[in-house]
């Protein structure tokens, strides 16, 4: 097995869309990659595409469904000995339906992927690499992680979790003096397989549905801008589709007088 001494970037959900383009973008910068997704054939195709122009890179592909309980932990254990520097939690999907009509099996799987797997990976990556120079955790949220979108309440709730969790983690890391940085990327409508999955549709036309939208390559470019910046949030405006690099958006009760006193013994 080829294993380099450089630092690796892990990208989940790398078989299509933003994850696919982000993998190519990081490879373009000379980063070795560990790519995870359900569809191993697409990962292998991506690996071949990258190596055709960057043959010196180490591109590790792992076919895994991280929405299945236990698979996220197993995947992490398989790669934890690699010298990791960047982890991008991109895997996720959405759902368009009224809460009272939504398919609960689909919602359960969505929460396992959007929330549970992301939290497991974030926690373990921070635990093992928080003092690694240059380490970054980038969690993919959504513009719907800062604004509630009609007919997408459950999806937005899952992305509000991603946004608030990552913003809070970013504060924890900074206040603890850790070298790692945590960031949130929140794109607006992007032409990917998201539309078909969210609507349980065989075909989905972004031109008809939205009129204005990002390409996956544009979104990956914005993600790189966030990676290069010292800001916590990279947010695409849902109306103008302009990209903003900002500080954390949620209120943080760090100095609230009614916070739990951490110096007290808790029984």
Regions found by a protein language model. Name each.
Residues 98-99, 106-111:
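Substrate-binding pocket helix/loop in short-chain dehydrogenase/reductase
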Residues 122, 158:
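Active-site helix of classical SDR
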Residues 8, 15-17:
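Conserved glycine-rich cofactor-binding loop
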Residues 90-95:
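Conserved NAD(P)H cofactor-binding loop of Rossmann-fold oxidoreductase domains
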Residues 142:
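Residue(s) in the substrate-gating loop at a strand-loop-helix junction
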Residues 184-186, 200-251:
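C-terminal helical subdomain
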Residues 29-46:
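Conserved glycine-rich Rossmann-like NAD(P)H-binding loop of the short-chain dehydrogenase/reductase
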């Amino acid at each position: 097995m080829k294993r380099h001494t450089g630092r690796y970037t892990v990208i989940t959900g790398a078989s299509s869309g933003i994850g696919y383009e982000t993998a190519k973008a990081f490879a373009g910068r000379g980063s070795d990659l560990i790519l995870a997704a359900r569809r191993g054939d697409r990962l292998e195709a991506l690996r071949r595409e990258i190596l055709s122009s960057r043959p010196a890179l180490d591109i590790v592909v792992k076919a895994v469904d991280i929405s299945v309980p236990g698979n996220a932990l197993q995947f992490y254990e398989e790669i934890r000995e690699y010298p990791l520097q960047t982890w991008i939690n991109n895997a996720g999907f959405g759902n368009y339906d009224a809460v009272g009509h939504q398919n609960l099996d689909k919602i359960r799987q969505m929460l396992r992927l959007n929330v549970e797997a992301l939290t497991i990976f974030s926690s373990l990556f921070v635990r093992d690499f928080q003092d690694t120079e240059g380490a970054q955790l980038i969690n993919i949220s959504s513009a719907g992680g800062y604004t509630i979108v009609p007919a997408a309440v459950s999806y937005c709730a899952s992305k509000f979790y991603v946004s608030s969790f990552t913003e809070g983690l970013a504060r924890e890391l900074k206040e603890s003096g850790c070298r790692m940085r945590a960031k949130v990327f929140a794109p607006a409508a992007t032409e990917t397989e998201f539309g078909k999955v969210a609507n349980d549709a065989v075909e989905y036309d972004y031109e008809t549905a939205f009129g204005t939208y990002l390409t996956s390559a544009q979104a990956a470019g914005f993600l790189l801008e966030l990676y290069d910046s010292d800001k916590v949030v990279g947010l695409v405006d849902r109306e103008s589709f302009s990209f903003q690099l900002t500080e954390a958006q949620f209120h943080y009760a760090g100095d609230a007088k009614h916070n739990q006193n951490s110096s007290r013994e808790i029984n």
